[in-house]
Curated annotation (Swiss-Prot):
Family affiliation: Belongs to the universal ribosomal protein uS2 family.
Annotated disulfide bonds: none
Example GO BP: translation
Name of the protein in its database record: Small ribosomal subunit protein uS2
Length: 264
């Protein structure tokens, strides 16, 4: 789990310039240095550990967690960690309706799958050069926007967001659907929009990497706990005696007979 040394080395304590702050973050600010707000790392550490446990427990319950971070400093790091633990992610651009109009998103994902099937079967080679080029461009665009959510069959139970100020649409959709939001909370962000905030820098690459790493580890730890629980339950479960169709029919006949006799 994260330590104070980790936070200092990754520059998690550096907030934004004082003129860009959100007054609601005042309780998380330690002071000012050269017109930059310094975040109170004692509070960061406390919130970090609390949120780590929240994410771990959600994962242990089998809940799905989506990673969101589209800005330049975050997109590659976020993709790396999301793919390493096989969770859905959006790292290029948030398409409106990604959550609130999920059925349409699934249809777009299906288009991507159809194009891939055409490639694998060789069917795409039967098209004209122009048609093939257009379809391959379509595939490239769909994969760019939806590659991270192509295996997501339902909306996530929780989202982890890098920079809630930038990802306004994603945050608004999650809040509309009452999906809990986990996020680093920089000094320019609104704490009221985040269910599980972690006061800290959401711009520096090292800081972003630390947040992604810790949330990924929390998810993996939760999965391990869930697996242990399943194994433990299997060891203690009694052998189930299945009822045959004949026994079911016999039992239903007896019940029907009792009902008839009771009516008389």
């Amino acid at each position: 789990m994260v330590t104070m040394k980790d936070l200092l080395e990754c520059g998690v304590h550096f907030g934004h310039q004082t003129r860009r702050w959100n007054p609601k973050t005042k309780k998380f600010i330690f002071g000012v240095r050269k017109n930059i707000h310094i975040i109170d790392l004692q509070k960061t550490l406390r919130y970090f550990r609390y949120t780590y446990n929240i994410v771990r427990d959600a994962s242990a319950q089998g809940k799905s967690i989506m990673f969101v971070g589209t800005k330049k400093q975050a997109n590659e790091t976020l993709k790396e960690f999301a793919e390493s633990i096989q969770v859905p992610y959006v790292n290029y651009r948030w398409l409106g309706g990604m959550l609130t109009n999920f059925s349409t998103i699934r249809k777009s994902v299906r288009k991507l799958e159809i194009i891939e099937e055409m490639e694998n079967s060789g069917q795409i080679d039967l098209l004209t050069k122009k048609e093939k080029l257009m379809i391959l461009r379509k595939k490239e665009k769909l994969d760019k926007y939806l590659g991270g959510v192509r295996h997501m069959k339902k909306i996530p139970d929780m989202i982890f967001v890098i920079d809630v100020a930038k990802e306004k649409i994603a945050v608004a959709e999650a809040r509309k659907l009452h999906i809990p939001i986990v996020a680093p909370l920089d000094t320019n962000c609104d704490p009221d929009l985040v269910d599980y905030p972690i006061p800290g820098n959401d711009d520096a690459i090292r800081s972003i990497r630390l947040f992604c790493k810790e949330m990924s580890e929390a998810i993996l730890e939760g999965r391990e706990l869930m697996q242990e629980e399943i194994v433990h339950a299997d060891e203690n479960s009694e052998e189930i005696e299945y009822v045959s169709n004949e026994e079911k029919e016999e039992m239903l006949a007896e019940i029907q007979k009792e009902i008839t006799q009771g009516a008389e």
